[in-house]
Design a protein with these regions (language model features):
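Alpha-helical repeat scaffolds
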Residues: 42-43, 69-82, 99-110
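Residue-level recognition of tetratricopeptide repeat
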Residues: 19, 50-55, 82, 113-119
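TPR-adjacent "capping" and linker segments in tetratricopeptide-repeat scaffold/adaptor proteins
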Residues: 2-22, 74-85
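Alpha-helical junction/boundary sensor with strong preference for TPR arrays
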Residues: 31, 48-49, 78-81, 112-113, ...
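Alpha-helical segment of the N-proximal tetratricopeptide repeat
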Residues: 16-44, 48, 85-104, 122
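Specific register positions within alpha-helical solenoid repeats of the TPR/Sel1-like families, i.e.
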Residues: 29-32, 57-65, 94-95, 127-128
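Asp-box/WD-like beta-propeller blade repeats and closely related beta-sheet repeat scaffolds
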Residues: 103-107, 111, 115-127
Length: 131
């Protein structure tokens, strides 16, 4: 097996902007690493593409790490992929406290998208003292 044989799939990103996608990925990486520039990266992604749902979710999660309540961004179901809808639901359910349902949704989502870094990391935020 070659090193490239294993691919950690992520949900398809509904942005046409490569720059927004780069800011999103850098912002999520910074968020899970606890780096202060996460919100700036995610803000840049949403500024470049105001309809980029996952970047808006990332910003809301970044705000929640600072103690703000999680406010899910509105979704337009016709414009987002199934993977993005799952991602949005998992974040909302996790941060609103339904731990058992969140675990089940997360498990199902990660079978298809094991590289969804925010979803992999999210339980750490939901634990007492984890954020």
């Amino acid at each position: 097996m070659t090193p490239n044989a294993i691919r950690w799939e992520v949900p398809p990103l509904t942005t046409t902007s490569v720059e927004a996608a780069i800011h999103y990925r850098d912002g999520i990486a910074a968020l899970v690493a606890g780096i202060a520039s996460a919100d700036q990266q995610l803000l840049a992604a949403t500024t470049i593409d105001p309809g980029f749902l996952l970047a808006h979710i990332g910003r809301a999660v970044a705000d929640a790490t600072g103690g703000a309540p999680y406010v899910p961004p509105p979704t337009s179901s016709s414009l987002v992929t199934r993977g993005e809808r799952q991602h949005a639901e998992i974040v909302a359910v996790t941060l609103c406290g339904d731990v058992h349902r969140a675990r089940d949704l997360r498990r199902e989502h990660l079978l298809e998208f094991p590289g969804d870094l925010l979803i992999v990391w999210l339980p750490m935020l939901a634990r007492p003292g984890g954020g």
